[in-house]
UniProtKB/Swiss-Prot annotation:
The gene is Mterf4. Its main location: mitochondrion. Residues 322-346 have a biased composition (Acidic residues). Residues 321-346 are annotated as: Disordered. InterPro entries: MTERF, MTERF_sf. Widely expressed, with highest levels in liver, followed by testis, kidney and brain. It is found in: Mitochondrion. GO terms for biological process: camera-type eye development; heart development; mitochondrial transcription; protein targeting to mitochondrion; regulation of DNA-templated transcription; ribosome assembly; rRNA processing. Regulator of mitochondrial ribosome biogenesis and translation. Binds to mitochondrial ribosomal RNAs 16S, 12S and 7S. Targets NSUN4 RNA methyltransferase to the mitochondrial large ribosomal subunit. This is Transcription termination factor 4, mitochondrial.
Amino acid sequence: MASLGRQVPEWHRLLALSWACLVRQTPHLREQKQMSPSLSCKLTTVPGRGSFQEFSSITPQKYMQEPENRTRLVQCLHEEQKPCVDPESLEPEKVIRSLQDMGFAEAHIHSLFSIQPSVHPQQLLGIVSELLLLGLNPEPVFNALKKNPQLLKLSSMQMKRRSSYLRKLGLGEGKLKRVLSVCPEVFTMHQRDIDRVVKVLREKCLFTAQHITDVLHRCPTVLQEDPNELEYKFQYAYFRMGLTHLDIVRTNFLQYSITKIKQRHIYLERLGRYQTPDKKGQTQIPNPSLRNILRVSEAEFLARTACSSVEEFQVFKKLLDQEEEEESESHASEEEEEEEEEEELL
């Protein structure tokens, strides 16, 4: 009986402490604390000498003098009330650490997450990893994603399939690296559009497999061109300017617009500074190199190649536009006449 009496105060203190901790963390229980008779009544215990003694109800302030028991109980309460951590909330942190390990700067990492906010962090990490496997450094990868944010919406499998297809065209890791840097849209284009361009280069322009590889490596934007316009550009170079397949490939001829090509070529032709080679590839005058025709600024072209003024070239371009417009209208009227004749025959 005496031992039971000694255990009662300890039990009473623990009960009071538990209630006090809960009241502090849960405000709406304070009113219940005031109304609870079990914590406000006096306890009667039996001391060691056998006489009864009354103990007042133990308040939280009194129990604060028991540091060891208080610390143990508070730790238990905190462990029970500790919220669960969602594993998905930790994924951005893991992705950030992975990007840092790959060599990305903090500013680039922040920008990567803002390029496509709706993209899952793990998907972003997968695309970045695939691009790095192509041989790119973090800086070119960041620039490619910034230039074409749609890359982040691809799956890793789609990236692998497109990379595999481009490798079949002869674009290995080194060449594929340049293609992605210059024209990242290659990875998000429809497969049929790429096939059409490759078909024109092979069947209409009669480029060899090696020529096609070199064209795509040197001028990746060719893949974005309309196949019919690409064919016309080749025909103009081959028949009007007398260029060979090798000339077209080595000078990156197909990357220039047909408007720029015609303006500068025809202008030189009318000035007597360019002549179409004969079947043997010979001319009566030395033609300027394609580099000095197309790969220079307009000011340098006029000063060094055409030896003409800006005003004269501007007037020529306006006249050339009128000629092409009239030619187009004439061609359209001829087609209408042919259609009418066919209808009359039917």
